Amino acid sequence: MVTTILIAASAILVLLLLRLLFVLPASNRFGFLYRPKHSNPKLMVMMGSGGHTGEMLRMLKTLKLQSYAKRVYVSSSGDVDSLEKVKVLESTTKTDIKTMVLENIPRARKVGQSYPSSVITSAVSFAVAVKLVHKHKPHVIVCNGPATCVMLCYAAFLLRFMALIDTRIIYVESLARVNRLSLSGLILLPFCDRFLVQWPQLAEKYPRAEYHGILV
């Protein structure tokens, strides 16, 4: 009986490991060659507040937002300014305002908050992020930091691991990061399908990082 249980547990563990290796972009060099095409693509964008929002808005201006059937903009709780700027951006493009959705999630860690206490706030942020990603099921998530975007990307990866969504994650490192990645970037590097940096030395230093010039 015990032997049977051990064999079954080992088999399940192996299957879970194989699933992880299949889903984890860092372990699958050909993973992003599979690009599912959707007739009604849905885009989710994390607005990171402050300078992060400024850089993201400049990148979004280069996209054909009208080609996305649904655009979900996510901000941290209390970040009203970022969402107002999104409304301005959407109003200047040829998009249907009805296909735009504004959401927010609790901050993973507030400014000046101690790391021990941030465990609870991060858990709450992650739980809300899971619910949000599962609700909208975006085909692509684009983010550029800070900490709260980690929760959003982790949520997407978990749901993808469970085969509940088929979402691709694109992370764009800040222009301010010249010689080394941000903490958010380091954490998310193995989990992103595309990881874009804006300085060539970063692409040389970090495997999987891509340099395609200044993006903002």
Swiss-Prot record:
Topological domains, Lumenal: 1-4
Gene3D superfamilies for the chain: Glycogen Phosphorylase B
Top-level taxon of the source organism: Eukaryota
Keyword Transmembrane helix among record annotations: yes
Subcellular location(s) per record: Endoplasmic reticulum membrane; Nucleus membrane
TM stretches of this protein: 5-25
Membrane-protein topology: Single-pass membrane protein
Keywords carried by this UniProt record: Endoplasmic reticulum, Membrane, Nucleus, Transmembrane, Transmembrane helix
Positions in the Cytoplasmic compartment: 26-216
UniProt keyword annotation of rRNA-binding present: no
Example GO BP: dolichol-linked oligosaccharide biosynthetic process
Signal peptide from the UniProt entry: none
GO CC terms in record: nuclear membrane; UDP-N-acetylglucosamine transferase complex
Annotated function: Involved in protein N-glycosylation. Essential for the second step of the dolichol-linked oligosaccharide pathway.
Family: Belongs to the ALG14 family.
Quaternary data: Heterodimer with ALG13 to form a functional enzyme.
Protein name: UDP-N-acetylglucosamine transferase subunit ALG14
Source species of the chain: Yarrowia lipolytica (strain CLIB 122 / E 150)
